[in-house]
């Protein structure tokens, strides 16, 4: 009798503030979990919004951790090991130009709320270039059957909710207003590293494994 193979670990390459920084702490508290320490965090109390409603609304980004995806979660192709992934990330990070991000704005992106770079800001070009490089250079390491597709039109975003239809319209409005106020004090962020996250089993919480600094 054969033993079924365990599902492969999936990885995500993303932007994320450095753990311990104010930018990381702010996002982790909003979501209710620190993906670096793998510990829950107390969420914001929003007047008029039940705690369980906010917890439900933030469930999806809480599982993924505080990250802006550059390459969608992927499993390693057969024969590719962790060392090869680390080497590829080092090469990739050293090929990218760091940039300062402007103050991020709360916007609706599809059916979620997220922090985004203003559409007219030049940083979007650098972020789009980095995302394209991630997809191109890591494609050879990825198992096509273990990948999730990202939208063809990339837009940098840090998700702060899951699907808005999980709560009613008045709650959506209260959460939007609270997010605008909460993140208005977010310190300026720099895109100067690639963050590597891992999902150890299907449906498990993602963990932040590493930050690979850009060399320039």
Predicted regions and their residues:
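Basic, often amphipathic N-terminal segments
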Residues: 1-109, 125-185, 201-216
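Short histidine-centered catalytic/ligand-binding loop motif
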Residues: 75, 116-123
